[in-house]
Amino acid sequence: MKYPKEYLDEIKTRLKVSTVVSKSVSLKKRGKEFVGLSPFKTEKTPSFTVNDEKEFYHCFATSEHGNIFDFVMKTQNLKFGEAVKSLENLAG
């Protein structure tokens, strides 16, 4: 199913990337970003960053990056439509 850009933007407006990511990754605020251990790789030193202002995450250990939809698809093994529904429920 194709979703209108306005609808996806509304979900992104209601949910900060850090809010979505922090449900599965422990994040600490560092300046304008949040940092934490990568959900994509076992590590001891945090290499995973989240930037709410730019609406994306990036893992320096694996080069994974994207927005809230990408994160939910990758970490929960969902298709795009399923990720939208999951975030839709979270956004209320």
PLM region spans:
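N-terminal structured subdomain of primase-like DNA metabolism proteins
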Residues: M1-G92
